[in-house]
Curated annotation (Swiss-Prot):
GO cellular component, one term: cytoplasm
PANTHER family in the record: 30S RIBOSOMAL PROTEIN S16, SMALL RIBOSOMAL SUBUNIT PROTEIN BS16M
GO terms for MF: structural constituent of ribosome
Organism: Neorickettsia sennetsu (strain ATCC VR-367 / Miyayama) (Ehrlichia sennetsu)
InterPro entries xrefs: Ribosomal_bS16, Ribosomal_bS16_CS, Ribosomal_bS16_dom_sf
Signal peptide, first to last residue: none
HAMAP family: Ribosomal_bS16
Domain of life from the UniProt record: Bacteria
Name this polypeptide is given: Small ribosomal subunit protein bS16
Length: 85
């Protein structure tokens, strides 16, 4: 298992354009850059949508459970998103 050899993080990767951020929630090596290579996209976050919009945070809970069982640790922000569901 290739991904067991290093520390994994479930974190936000910034996309979009200047002053219009859009984030993908990804599983990546903890030493890779914020917007660098990642193993899998497990959700998305659009901070420009209203707080009650259901599309503001989209998560694939099954895949997040899988990656946490393998040893991936969510960042503080991603942990808040998961706790809200």
């Amino acid at each position: 298992m290739y991904y067991l050899l290093f520390m994994l993080k479930i974190r936000l990767a910034r996309f979009g354009r200047k002053k219009r951020p859009y984030y993908k929630i990804v599983v990546a090596n903890s030493s890779s850059p914020r917007d660098g290579k990642f193993l899998e996209q497990v959700g998305s976050y659009d901070p420009l949508l209203s707080k009650d919009d259901p599309l503001r945070v989209c998560l694939d809970i099954e895949r997040i459970r899988y990656w946490t069982s393998v040893g991936a640790k969510p960042t503080e922000r991603v942990a808040k998103f998961v706790a809200c569901l």
